[in-house]
């Protein structure tokens, strides 16, 4: 009887997930021609670092350094600080310059009539596709692998690199940590840069890097999730951070 019902908290978590991993099987768009978003998190080769306790894990992944954009330092601007109309208009720029905005970015405009919400009954929501974030412009994302594109519409830019099904994380070691002197066509994940910066304060010299991502189907008209990919890589900090000529990273 209740397999299709949600509590209020479940519904809110579902809405958050929906914005990050939507696919493109829905049909409704605004009048303008644009590529619809599948959800920003959906396109990432997600990585994060775990410590020996919750505090370490939070500190290892909490990159508090904000990079300037030109001469300006971006102000953190999550979606709830804007009206619905402002968020929709903002989505058509294809850009986000701050992590709070990126992590609360809308892939869909969703209307739920608050007067009609009754979690004992079926809910009706109205959904409209919003434009894709430009992957070449969102390099503030700290929790993804990156690849340098040499041809096509993203030529000469870095874009997030998704994990490959059946491929162990250790095979991506060469793009998790980048040797000194070859940074031009290689981009290190932001959480690894941050971890190296704070490692002098960390007594735990063993590091566990985790990979997580959703795989979508091969149909370009749906992009429905079909599989979750999870892996991890445990290693000593020396292996990760010795990047000079005599170091481990080469």
Model-found features: residue ranges?
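Extended alpha-helical scaffolding segments
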Residues: 1, 6, 17-250
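Cys/His-coordinated zinc-binding microdomains
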Residues: 8-11
């Amino acid at each position: 009887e209740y397999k299709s019902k949600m509590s209020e908290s479940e519904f809110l978590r579902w809405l958050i997930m929906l914005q990050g991993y939507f696919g493109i099987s829905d049909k409704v768009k605004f009048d303008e021609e644009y590529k619809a978003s599948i959800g920003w998190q959906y396109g990432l080769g997600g990585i994060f670092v775990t410590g020996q306790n919750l505090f370490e894990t939070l500190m290892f992944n909490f990159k508090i350094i904000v990079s300037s954009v030109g001469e300006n330092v971006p102000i953190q601007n999550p979606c709830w600080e804007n009206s619905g109309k402002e968020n929709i208009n903002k989505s058509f720029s294809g850009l986000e310059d701050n992590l709070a905005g990126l992590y609360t970015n809308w892939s869909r405009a969703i209307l739920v009539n608050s007067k009609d919400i009754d979690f004992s009954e079926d809910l009706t929501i109205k959904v409209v596709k919003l434009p894709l974030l430009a992957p070449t412009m969102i390099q503030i994302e700290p929790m993804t692998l990156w690849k340098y594109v040499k041809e096509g519409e993203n030529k000469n830019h870095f874009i997030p690199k998704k994990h490959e099904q059946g491929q162990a994380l250790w095979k991506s070691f060469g793009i998790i940590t980048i040797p000194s002197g070859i940074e031009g066509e290689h981009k290190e994940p932001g959480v690894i840069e941050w971890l190296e910066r704070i490692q002098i304060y960390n007594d735990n010299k063993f590091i566990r890097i985790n990979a997580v991502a959703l795989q979508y189907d091969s149909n370009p008209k749906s992009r429905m999730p079909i599989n979750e990919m999870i892996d991890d890589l445990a290693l000593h900090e020396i292996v990760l951070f010795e990047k000079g000529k005599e170091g481990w990273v080469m």
